[in-house]
């Protein structure tokens, strides 16, 4: 299959992956309304073309949490990344490091912190949930520190798991899920060999290291479901500050009031996010939520955004709407599933090229020059 655009990797991933894995990353919550609007709302934003601006000098570099990024992009935390390619978190982290952008390891990764961190030559980020098992949380923070993690991404929009109906249809969950997954793997021999056989162990490395026994796919939903904590409040974040003195980014902000509370708390950054449409269906897309949040807290902390970003044009749109940087989730997992580390590197190169074209043709010579003036109109205008 020819890959000529960043969006081509989705079809390539679907061909290679067993359905339960493809639909797990591709799907969203309930009727997937927000999942669709994330992409549609971004695509509806028109950029303002400008010409004859002498764009011979152009820089995509940006500074974030005392790090220099080659472009305002980081790879988002995605659970079970290691099921999409052999030791997938390591491959994705290497690709990100090679392109000069951060990689964020998920709490529920296949590869543990201690396997991923030594594989790259730049510090990585780590994502953590609020869980009932505070001992696990403290253990994860201590291990992250020891591994040289620089930035903590704290996910706050999962006090309960979202209802992802597509998972039950595809075999990720629901009746007879385990035998259905086995049958699907048998009809996808390339994945079965590369990941199913050579990619073992298939446990959740960060959790297994704490529990002292493997935490396999069968335990994944049960363990998380039993440990998500609906009593989460800002006091829990204060408790985390006792164990983490580095940059802390709060992921899952969609309302300006919550953004202001993050400033009061002393967060270093927020991620404007609806969890890729995987939690509460019917909420605002990140693109629609971002401008009001930027108006409320721009300059008081770093604003990142995710959900719906598939191309370099989308990155430029999010920056113009008020983000300082973005997180790529599904986009990099599609590329990883299709072509491993090389696929993720190529995806980032395509994103960079698309950004350069957009910046040249909107007259923005640096990331700092991308603003609302780069847009023909704002959403809803």
From Swiss-Prot:
Keywords: Cell inner membrane, Cell membrane, Flavoprotein, FMN, Membrane, Oxidoreductase
One Gene Ontology MF term: L-lactate dehydrogenase activity
N-terminal signal peptide: none
Top EC class for this record: oxidoreductase
Cofactor: FMN
The FMN hydroxy acid dehydrogenase domain, residue ranges: 1-380
Catalytic residues (UniProt): 275 (proton acceptor)
Family affiliation: Belongs to the FMN-dependent alpha-hydroxy acid dehydrogenase family.
NCBIfam families the UniProt entry points to: L_lactate_LldD, PRK11197.1
Entry protein name: L-lactate dehydrogenase
Higher taxonomy: Bacteria, Pseudomonadati, Pseudomonadota, Gammaproteobacteria, Pseudomonadales
């Amino acid at each position: 299959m020819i890959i000529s655009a960043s969006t081509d990797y989705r079809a390539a991933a679907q061909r290679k992956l067993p359905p339960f894995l493809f639909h797990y990353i591709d799907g969203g919550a309930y009727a997937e309304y927000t999942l669709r609007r994330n992409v549609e709302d971004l695509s509806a934003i028109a950029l303002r073309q400008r010409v004859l601006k002498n764009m011979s000098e152009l820089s995509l570099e940006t500074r974030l949490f005392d790090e220099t990024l080659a472009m305002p992009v980081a790879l988002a935390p995605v659970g079970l990344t290691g099921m999409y390619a052999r030791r997938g978190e390591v491959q994705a982290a290497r690709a990100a490091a090679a392109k000069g952008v951060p990689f964020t390891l998920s709490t529920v990764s296949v590869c543990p912190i201690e396997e991923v961190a030594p594989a790259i030559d730049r510090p990585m980020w780590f994502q953590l949930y609020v869980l009932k098992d505070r001992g696990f949380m403290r253990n994860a923070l201590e291990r992250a520190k020891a591994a040289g993690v620089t930035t903590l991404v704290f996910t706050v929009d999962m006090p309960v798991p979202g209802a992802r109906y597509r998972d039950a249809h595809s075999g990720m969950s629901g009746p007879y899920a385990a035998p259905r997954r086995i049958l699907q793997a048998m009809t996808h021999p390339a994945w079965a060999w590369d990941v199913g056989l050579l990619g073992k162990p298939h446990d959740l490395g960060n959790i297994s290291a704490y529990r002292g026994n493997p935490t396999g796919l069968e335990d994944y939903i049960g363990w998380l479901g039993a440990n998500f904590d609906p009593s989460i409040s800002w006091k829990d974040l204060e408790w985390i500050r006792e164990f983490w003195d580095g940059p802390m980014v709060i992921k899952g902000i969609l309302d300006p009031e919550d953004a202001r509370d993050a400033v009061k708390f002393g967060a270093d950054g927020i991620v404007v996010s609806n969890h890729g449409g995987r939690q509460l269906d019917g909420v605002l897309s990140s693109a629609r939520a971002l401008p009001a949040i930027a108006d409320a807290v721009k300059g008081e902390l770093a604003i990142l955004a995710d959900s719906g970003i598939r191309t370099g044009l989308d990155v430029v749109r999010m920056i113009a709407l008020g983000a300082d940087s973005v997180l790529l989730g599904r986009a990099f997992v599609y590329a990883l599933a299709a072509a491993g580390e090389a696929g993720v590197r190529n995806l980032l190169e395509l994103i960079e090229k698309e950004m350069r074209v957009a910046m040249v043709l909107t007259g923005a010579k640096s990331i700092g020059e991308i603003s609302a003036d780069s847009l023909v109109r704002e959403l809803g205008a």
